[in-house]
């Protein structure tokens, strides 16, 4: 089974998250996408973060597609960093083929994530285009560091079963929605 892992604060979850998930399901030929609602992002302001249980409930109410599952399990395993969460999942579910899903906006700061290189060694990564990042994301520090691991977009359906490191940048219709913009309204 091919599972896309889409981590984030989901503060709040919105139609843009659904767009990214459906794009990944279709373009990567995934069976499921799991939304990993984080208890707290070390790189973001926690002062504006709604409680985890509220964000999980709101995300579940939005994600009515049966192929999308919402979980807040990271809090239960005491994980603070994506690399730890992904290592935990890979060890417990060795038969599954995981792909980490991220928006192109996150690729610009990916090199600041703790052990970002380990994430790329644990599973392939799919970067979904976002407005304003089409041209800048591929020149991001992490993208340059792993330039040789980038696969052609036409090969994206094979990403889940490729040896790591491997990543793909997926162009296409983009959603301008963002949780930050929704919170400031």
Curated annotation (Swiss-Prot):
Known EC number: 2.7.7.18
Assigned keywords, A-Z: ATP-binding, NAD, Nucleotide-binding, Nucleotidyltransferase, Pyridine nucleotide biosynthesis, Transferase
GO biological process: NAD biosynthetic process
A matching Pfam family: CTP_transf_like
Domain of life: Bacteria
Broad enzyme group: transferase
Keyword ATP-binding found: yes
Pathway: Cofactor biosynthesis; NAD(+) biosynthesis; deamido-NAD(+) from nicotinate D-ribonucleotide: step 1/1
InterPro entries: Cyt_trans-like, NadD/NMNAT, Rossmann-like_a/b/a_fold
Nucleotide-binding in keyword set: yes
Catalytic activity: nicotinate beta-D-ribonucleotide + ATP + H(+) = deamido-NAD(+) + diphosphate
Disulfide pairings: none
GO MF annotation: an example: ATP binding
Gene3D superfamilies linked: HUPs (3.40.50.620)
Function, in words: Catalyzes the reversible adenylation of nicotinate mononucleotide (NaMN) to nicotinic acid adenine dinucleotide (NaAD).
NCBIfam families xrefs: nicotinate (nicotinamide) nucleotide adenylyltransferase (TIGR00482), PRK00071.2-2 (NF000843), PRK00071.2-4 (NF000845)
Family: Belongs to the NadD family.
Protein name listed in UniProt: Probable nicotinate-nucleotide adenylyltransferase
Organism of provenance: Methylorubrum extorquens (strain CM4 / NCIMB 13688) (Methylobacterium extorquens)
Origin organism lineage: Bacteria, Pseudomonadati, Pseudomonadota, Alphaproteobacteria, Hyphomicrobiales
């Amino acid at each position: 089974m091919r599972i896309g892992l889409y981590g984030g604060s989901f503060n709040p979850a919105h139609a843009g998250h659904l767009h990214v998930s459906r794009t990944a399901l279709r373009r990567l030929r995934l069976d499921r996408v799991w939304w990993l609602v984080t208890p707290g992002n070390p790189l973001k302001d926690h002062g504006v973060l709604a409680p985890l249980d509220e964000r999980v409930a709101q995300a579940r109410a939005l994600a009515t597609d049966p192929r999308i599952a919402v979980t807040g399990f990271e809090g239960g395993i005491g994980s603070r960093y994506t690399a730890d969460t992904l290592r935990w999942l890979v060890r417990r579910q060795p038969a599954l083929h995981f792909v980490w899903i991220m928006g192109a906006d996150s690729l610009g700061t990916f090199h600041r994530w703790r052990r970002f290189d380990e994430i790329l060694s644990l599973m392939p990564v799919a970067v979904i285009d976002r407005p304003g990042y089409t041209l800048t994301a591929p020149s991001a520090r992490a993208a340059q560091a792993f330039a040789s691991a980038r696969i052609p977009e036409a090969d994206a359906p094979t990403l889940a079963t490729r040896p790591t490191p491997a990543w793909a940048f997926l162009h296409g219709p983009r959603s301008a929605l963002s949780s930050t913009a929704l919170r400031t309204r």
